[in-house]
Design a protein with these regions (language model features):
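N-terminal secretory signal peptides that target proteins for export/translocation
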Residues: 1-6
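Bacterial N-terminal signal peptides
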Residues: 10-19
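Sec/Tat signal peptide C-region and signal peptidase I cleavage site
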Residues: 22-26
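N-terminal module-boundary/linker segments of secreted carbohydrate-active enzymes
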Residues: 27-53
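Domain-level detector of nuclease and nuclease-like folds
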Residues: 55-216
Length: 216
């Protein structure tokens, strides 16, 4: 099995504050109406941290094995989340339209766990106002619009870096991305996610509420 954590783990300075989730939980006046939101957050999860934390918890479930038991990943797509300027919608259709298996399997190169894909559709995709296929096409388009800095594609040893330095690396690699459109989240001194704000047509845009909750 690839030495995923040992050689690929990405560390955040232990002095950093822990971060909360993007956006407040309070809903705005639109009350989870599908398609009624202000912008997207593309959330990119740092896979080595996820796998290391899962190992420490003794979590060897099917979803963990799908991401952590095969080829080593760096950043994987956690999701594309509709957001309000303050807060976010979720689970906008109950019951949610059934996600076709062929759509799920088509996304495994970006989101390497079936359970994650189904959950993202139920929780976030149903709020996009898009059909199943169009929503996951939007995820693929959003991911293609973001270039991962070269130095984080193939780490050979643990690395410690400040969140601002990581943000700067993404900004340099992605013309048009500003520090008001990106945030870095961490957990227990490890990199957790990079979150990038995008307009509904998937262009980089500022998001003060999301950035305010980043690691600093």
């Amino acid at each position: 099995m690839p030495r995923l954590v040992t050689i690929s783990r990405f560390l955040i300075s232990a002095a950093l504050m822990l971060c909360g989730a993007a956006g407040a939980s309070a809903q705005d006046r639109r009350q989870n109406a599908p398609g009624e939101f202000d912008f997207y957050v593309l959330s990119l999860s740092w896979s080595p941290s996820f796998c290391e934390a899962a190992s420490e918890r003794g979590n060897n479930g099917r979803g963990t094995q799908a991401q952590c038991g095969g080829r080593p990943y760096s950043f994987v797509v956690h999701g594309l989340w509709p957001q309000y300027e303050r807060g976010f919608p979720e689970y906008c259709q109950r019951p949610s339209p059934r996600l076709a298996r062929n759509i799920m399997t088509s996304m495994l190169d970006l989101m390497p766990a079936p359970g994650l894909i189904y959950n993202e559709w139920d929780k976030h995709g149903t709020c996009s106002g898009l059909g199943e296929r169009a929503y996951f096409e939007a995820i693929r388009k959003a991911r293609a619009a973001v270039k991962i800095p070269e130095e984080f594609l193939q780490l050979s040893e643990p690395k410690t870096i400040a969140p601002d330095e990581l943000e700067t690396a993404f900004i340099k690699a992605n013309p048009g991305l500003s520090n008001s459109a990106i945030s870095v989240t961490c957990n227990s001194g490890r990199l957790s996610e990079v979150r990038i704000c995008m307009s509904k047509d998937l262009q980089f845009r500022a998001c003060e509420e999301v950035d305010r909750r980043a690691c600093r």
